[in-house]
UniProtKB/Swiss-Prot annotation:
Cofactor(s) required for function per UniProt: Mg(2+); Mn(2+)
Processing and modification events after translation: Cleaved and activated by different proteases depending on the complement pathway to generate complement C2a and serine protease complement C2b chains. Cleaved and activated by C1S following activation by the classical complement system. Cleaved and activated by MASP2 following activation by the lectin complement system. Cleaved and activated by GZMK following activation by the GZMK complement system.
Active site (UniProt): H507, D561, S679
SS bond list: C24-C64, C51-C84, C89-C131, C117-C144, C151-C191, C177-C204, C463-C581, C492-C508, C584-C600, C638-C665, C675-C705
UniProt note: domains: The MIDAS-like motif in the VWFA domain binds divalent metal cations.
CDD domains: CCP, Tryp_SPc, vWA_complement_factors
Family that this chain belongs to: Belongs to the peptidase S1 family.
One cellular component term from this protein's GO annotations in UniProt: extracellular region
Site feature: Cleavage: R243, K244
Motif MIDAS-like motif, chain ranges: 260-264
GO biological process: complement activation; complement activation, classical pathway; innate immune response; proteolysis; response to bacterium
Gene name linked to the record: C2
PROSITE patterns: SUSHI, TRYPSIN_DOM, TRYPSIN_HIS, TRYPSIN_SER, VWFA
Name of the protein this chain belongs to: Complement C2
Length: 752
């Protein structure tokens, strides 16, 4: 499920060595800033300017030519004086279905832009954004959406122009940047069948902009942890080290580390490249996964220090030793940056491994690949590096179904003549992820690699993983699903939300039976994977009272129909038993690949973002059935049917007395209806091959299993039935205070 990431880290920093015999003039000061030299004043040395935060150098760098003159990369004319200019953030070109203020041509550091939507549209993203000192906006792209499309409105990032205004299945939208801005992300996106746009959100940025380490580390860490979890959904948790993923024989990761050693990289910067790569190796081996690591240094030519075909590539000590022995002087005669040759070395390694294992074998096809390329700038010899990337994609058979088997992350270091277009061209394009970055210096790079895979912060993040293969059992497809019974007869369902807690409905316990006699079946009861658990504690919502409104003529009322069960023992994780993701938690945030700083409202806007949201519940026989959750105006029309139910609600005048905003509504169109006995089970959605519980089955107007003892037999209601079927599910977004009160020590909740 998760991608094995090919991290493509491009690093640019030119700090320098003072040479006693200058060949180029030394009158190169910058007003208000400083500069460094990669190799003193000698030909081939790169001069790099720096300015205080909030300013950027113009030009960014100069190269000492053999003629003894400074050349400004990319300049069409000679610049006599280097200056520090104020950083600006790009302005919106347009904002659909709303307004933004103030309207400026560009925005200064610290400046804000605010967004409001027209009536009938809901704002997604950040209502206010601030220009940061790196030339990037904080927050997320603001979008005014009415939820009418198959895919949500993809929005228009600041500084971008979009063509395409239809959001149905198969529709495409295209983006370009205004003025001299550079586009990163996908220039074209397609609305896919799962309601998600292909590719990566396009961002228009100033050529001099860069990324802060605190933004890059979580972005890389989230993607990498997702890749690790997806390599094989089976993992074990060790208390001392947090989550560790044990990949079975069928799962393997090849990690390729490519380090630039060209002349424009100083020896000190190369040492930091090595230290950063060592940090990455240390972190990745701490996950106890089956991993092979390749080490390649390059300048004009590549040098393979460790191949994934070498058995030592699976030994952390041997890999780190290879990194420590990497010698800067091995490439002292190579002045160019041949990124193509470095990537082609990876291709040749893959090709040799494919020949050994066999192209059609699972041993080859199940390997996931991650490439990390550390370089100082734009490739300048050997041809286009994208050609090598295309060959890599071809040999790995990367298509829509196998897209997760390759991730390329392009990270540049240093505000030099970094080619954003080349970085973006090489980096992978995946929904909800970024793969192209530029960091300000090697210190920032080191900081990113220190924090991107902090194992202690990944505890219990792998939730919502189901086995979707054709031969998977029903329980493997929904491993969080449990059955709850007093003594022998099954009465309700529930969902594992951690290794010891089950979420279910309060009305399952309204008879007040001794809970010590109850049992919870976890896993597949028909196989060795099923296990019966005692209940240590039952937490019933104090607000639940089915007869609370009986004196109003409402015979049954299901407000606050929610309960938690603490099992007497922890559940051992397996493909048959695994928690589902609860929205508004850090665990779900990682699964959704959302940035740090996301809120509970952000999760609700992402998961329940249309007027009709496809969802599922689990039937008595364990199969997954489909429903559509109605939102907005459609929720109102869905709930209004309750007024026709005269048996339970003979004197009902206000539907909201029965159907409060605590409930989600389904049952229209061709929806399945839950049976009696399915109450308490999860109502869940799929996003990016992960599953998220947004509700739990509570009550309804029709029982399709009435009169049948066969769990596989369900009867659809006649079209003439009055009232027509409607089903109501507790909305977990409306139960946050109660959930946080009782699960605050179990899950990591996000701000509301």
């Amino acid at each position: 499920m998760g991608p094995l990431m090919v991290l493509f880290c491009l690093l640019f920093v030119y700090t320098g060595l003072a040479d006693s015999a200058p060949s180029c003039p030394q009158n190169v000061n910058i007003s208000g800033g400083t500069f460094t030299l990669s190799h003193g004043w000698a030909p081939g040395s790169l001069l790099t300017y720096s300015c205080p935060q909030g300013l950027y150098p113009s030009p960014a760098s100069r190269l000492c030519k053999s003629s003894g003159q400074w050349q400004t990369p990319g300049a069409t004319r000679s610049l006599s004086k280097a200056v520090c200019k104020p950083v600006r953030c790009p302005a919106p070109v347009s904002f659909e279905n709303g307004i933004y203020t103030p309207r400026l041509g560009s925005y200064p550091v610290g400046g804000n832009v605010s967004f409001e939507c027209e009536d009938g549209f809901i704002l997604r993203g950040s209502p206010v954004r601030q220009c940061r000192p790196n030339g990037m906006w904080d927050g997320e792209t603001a979008v005014c959406d009415n939820g009418a499309g198959h895919c949500p409105n993809p929005g228009i990032s600041l500084g971008a122009v979009r063509t395409g205004f239809r959001f149905g299945h198969g529709d495409k939208v295209r983006y370009r940047c205004s003025s001299n801005l550079v586009l990163t992300g996908s220039s074209e996106r397609e609305c896919q069948g799962n309601g998600v746009w292909s590719g990566t959100e396009p961002i228009c940025r100033q050529p001099y902009s860069y990324d802060f380490p605190e933004d890059v580390a979580p972005a890389l860490g989230t993607s990498f942890s997702h890749m690790l979890g997806a390599t094989n959904p089976t993992q074990k948790t060790k208390e001392s080290l947090g989550r560790k993923i044990q990949i079975q024989r069928s799962g393997h990761l090849n990690l390729y580390l490519l380090l630039d050693c060209s002349q424009s990289v100083s020896e000190n910067d190369f040492l930091i490249f090595k230290e950063s790569a060592s940090l990455m190796v240390d972190r990745i081996f701490s996950f106890e996964i089956n991993v092979s690591v390749a080490i390649i240094t390059f300048a004009s030519k590549p040098k393979v220090l460790m191949s994934v075909l070498n058995d030592n590539s699976r030994d952390m000590t041997e890999v780190i030793s290879s990194l420590e022995n990497a010698n800067y002087k091995d490439h002292e005669n190579g002045t160019g940056t041949n990124t193509y040759a470095a990537l082609n070395s990876v291709y040749l390694m893959m090709n040799n491994q494919m020949r050994i294992l066999g192209m059609e074998t699972m041993a080859w096809q199940e390997i996931r690949h991650a490439i990390i390329l550390l370089t100082d700038g734009k490739s300048n010899m050997g041809g286009s590096p994208k050609t090598a990337v295309d060959r890599i994609r071809e040999i790995l058979n990367i298509n829509q179904k196998r897209n997760d088997y390759l991730d390329i992350y392009a990270i540049g270091v240093g505000k030099l003549d970094v080619d954003w277009r080349e970085l973006n061209e090489l980096g992978s394009k995946k929904d909800g992820e970024r793969h192209a970055f530029i960091l300000q210096d090697t210190k920032a790079l080191h900081q990113v690699f220190e924090h991107m895979l902090d194992v202690s912060k990944l505890t219990d993040t792998i939730c919502g993983v189901g086995n979707m293969s054709a031969n998977a059992s029903d329980q493997e497809r929904t491993p969080w699903h449990v059955t709850i019974k007093p003594k022998s007869q099954e009465t309700c369902r529930g969902a594992l939300i951690s290794d010891q807690w089950v979420l279910t409905a309060a009305h399952c316990f309204r008879d007040g039976n001794d809970h010590s006699l109850w049992r919870v079946n976890v896993g597949d009861p028909k196989s060795q994977w099923g296990k019966e658990f005692l209940i240590e504690k039952a937490v019933i919502s104090p607000g639940f009272d089915v007869f609370a409104k009986k004196n109003q003529g409402i015979l049954e009322f299901y407000g606050d129909d929610i309960a938690l069960l603490k099992l007497a023992q922890k559940v051992k994780m397996s493909t048959h038993a695994r928690p589902i993701c609860l929205p508004c938690t850090m665990e779900a945030n990682l699964a959704l690949r959302r940035p740090q700083g996301s809120t509970c409202r952000d999760h609700e806007n992402e998961l329940l973002n249309k007027q009709s949201v496809p969802a599922h519940f689990v039937a008595l026989n364990g199969s997954k059935l489909n429903i559509n959750l109605k939102m907005g105006v459609e929720w109102t029309s869905c709930a209004e049917v309750v007024s026709q139910e005269k048996t339970m609600f003979p004197n009902l005048t206000d539907v909201r007395e029965v159907v409060t905003d605590q409930f989600l509504c389904s049952g229209t169109q061709e929806d399945e209806s839950p049976c009696k006995g399915e109450s308490g089970g999860a109502v869940f959605l799929e996003r990016r091959f992960r599953f998220f519980q947004v509700g739990l089955v509570s009550w309804g107007l029709y029982n399709p299993c009435l009169g049948s003892a066969d769990k596989n037999s369900r009867k659809r209601a006649p079209r003439s039935k009055v009232p027509p079927p409607r089903d109501f599910h507790i909305n977990l977004f409306r139960m946050q205070p109660w959930l946080r009160q009782h699960l605050g020590d179990v899950l990591n909740f996000l701000p509301l």
